Structures are given as structure tokens and as C-alpha cells.
Amino acid sequence: MRAVMAGEVSTTDRRLTSPGEQVRPGIDLHVRGRSCYVSRGGLKLERGLSAFDVNPEGLSCLDVGCSTGGFTDCLLKRGAASVISVDVGYAQFSWELRQDPRVRLLERTNIVDVPAVVGSGVVDLAVCDVSFTSVTTVLPAVMELLRPSGTFLTLVKPQFEAPREDVGEGGVVRDQAVREAALERVRSAFEQAGLMVRGTCESPITGHKGNVEYLLCGVRDR
């Protein structure tokens, strides 16, 4: 059941999104291999780094909404020099990553408070995976932390970007037009904040409850 909810099970022509979904008897099912990262979030960021040709090697990085550390793990495995990992929660972050000297973990910390802790203009690359809030709410703090020409690569979750009335039962956005409008709102916010958008792509795996998610990348141009 967990594999289905994680978007890891598919038939030859479609991905299964519900454990109760019916398929024809005898049909072949394919299960995606397990992640090499501490969480499946690493696979999402891996896709974004490849799609937008972003190389973290030697860079000072920021992970907003680090949770268990999938994004942080991906950055480190790609050669990041350091990662400031931030989350409002606590006791979720991987024990293995906690021991890594390249990681500075800020738990129980809102991103808006981070510039006062670490200073301004200190990161080359920021990545983000936040829930129950819009990516646009973290933009001002991220911009303050980014160096000139720094890159911001974020996961965009339409279920937290779209108006409440456009989110379907169970918190799932099934309407493609609603998903695209949500993505466009974040894209527009990027441009208004001073980020030149390099592109967007769909996440290789779905989010919670099968929600389609996107990756959006921008480079600071002012």
C-alpha cells in the first residue's frame, strides 16, 4: 500500500495512485526501485538538478523544509560543500545526516528567522520542499540568503498553492488547469522577486495521496 501511495507502482501505461484502484486480472505491475537517499524526496531533487543542469559540487547550499533530509542527502551526494538544513519541526532529520560535519541543522526554525542567524548572501543554491504553505511565503527570506547569481530550485505542490475551493476531496488536485495555474502563480512570484526562471518540469514521483508535483528553477538576476 505504501508503494502505491508513493507513486512507485504502475502498469504498462499508467501510474497507480490509490491502493483501492482496480486493475485487470493478470496485468503486469511494475514497482520502482527504492531510493538511495534517506527519503524519496532525494529522487525529486535529483530530477530537478538534472533537468536544469544545476551542479551543487563545491557550493554552499540551503534546504528549506528539510524534514527527514532527502534534499540535503541528494545535495551532499552531489558534492555540496555545506548545507544549512531548516525546518519548523524537529526530530525528523536523519541521524546519519546529523553526524555529517557539512550539515548545519536548524530545527524548530522558521526560514524567515534564518538570515538573522546565519547572515545575508551566504548561499549559492537554495532548494525547497514545504507543505501547508505556499512557496511564495519563503521567497523573501530565500532571496536575502542567496548570493548574487544564486539559484533557487523548489518543489511546487499545487495542493498548497491553489485556492482552497479548487482543491478536491482529500486534498488532491485532479484538474490539470488548476495545477498549471498554481505553478504559474509561483513562477510569476519568482520573476517579481528577481529570479529569472530557467524552467519547470514534473516531479518523477507523486506527492502524498498521489498529488502531481512540479519542480521550478530560477536564478537571481538582481
Regions found by a protein language model. Give the residues of each.
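A short glycine-rich, Lys/Arg-flanked "PGG" loop and its adjoining helix->strand segment in the class I
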Residues: T136-L153
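Core SAM-dependent methyltransferase catalytic element
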Residues: I205-R222
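A basic, amphipathic helix-loop patch mediating RNA/tRNA/ribosome contacts
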Residues: M1-P25, S60
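S-adenosyl-L-methionine
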Residues: I84-T133, T137
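Conserved class I S-adenosyl-L-methionine
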Residues: E57-S67
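Conserved S-adenosyl-L-methionine
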Residues: C74-S82
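Short, glycine-/aromatic-enriched active-site segment of Class I SAM-dependent methyltransferases
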Residues: P158-D175
